[in-house]
A protein has these predicted regions:
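Positions that flank functional sites
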Residues: 22-24, 67
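Nucleotide-sugar-dependent glycosyltransferase catalytic core
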Residues: 24-45, 76-86
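Short alpha-helical functional segments enriched in proximate histidine and acidic residues
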Residues: 50-51, 94
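Extracellular glycan-interaction patches encoded by glycine-rich segments
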Residues: 54
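Non-catalytic, C-terminal membrane-associated alpha-helical segments of glycosyltransferases
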Residues: 60-144
Length: 144
């Protein structure tokens, strides 16, 4: 899902939220429950692929602190659920097999779209941090 959405943005499409939309997806149809070893490994690997395939090197470097922080937070989440080793295994598999991934090619107008996407990522991160901080402050206020 994320890969298609990111690539669509690169090619000039808008991603919009449509609450009335109905999507049929057999995501867990063959892989089992919400979280299992197979799905955790696959998700970790695919997160590596998503960024590598769609971002140029300058974006990977610019976003690396946030990407690494997000990877660490996901690792902690899956470790708490008993899937820490599976997450690391999938992440490392993604790194090892990057050479098999086909990156989105260059095309006219891509740099402008990349800059636009980058600004959206920065703004979205700022909003997320702000809202997360407010939720945490509200929790602390309720506990005091």
């Amino acid at each position: 899902r994320s890969d298609v959405g990111y690539r669509a943005k690169l090619y000039g499409y808008d991603n919009v939220f449509c609450p009335e939309a109905v999507v049929y997806h057999v995501g867990s149809g063959t892989s089992g429950s919400k979280y299992n070893s197979f799905k955790v490994k696959l998700a970790a690997r695919n997160n590596v692929y998503l960024n590598y395939k769609n971002m140029r090197t300058w974006q990977l470097l610019l976003n690396s602190p946030c990407l690494l922080a997000g990877t660490f937070v996901k690792f902690l989440f899956f470790k708490k659920m008993g899937f820490g080793k599976d997450y690391v295994s999938g992440f490392l598999e993604g790194i090892r097999t990057l050479k098999n991934c086909k990156r989105v090619p260059s095309f006219k107008g891509r740099i402008q779209r990349e800059i636009g996407i980058q600004l959206e990522l920065i703004a979205g991160t700022a909003v997320y941090v702000y809202e997360f901080s407010r939720r945490q402050a509200a929790k602390l206020g309720a506990k005091v």
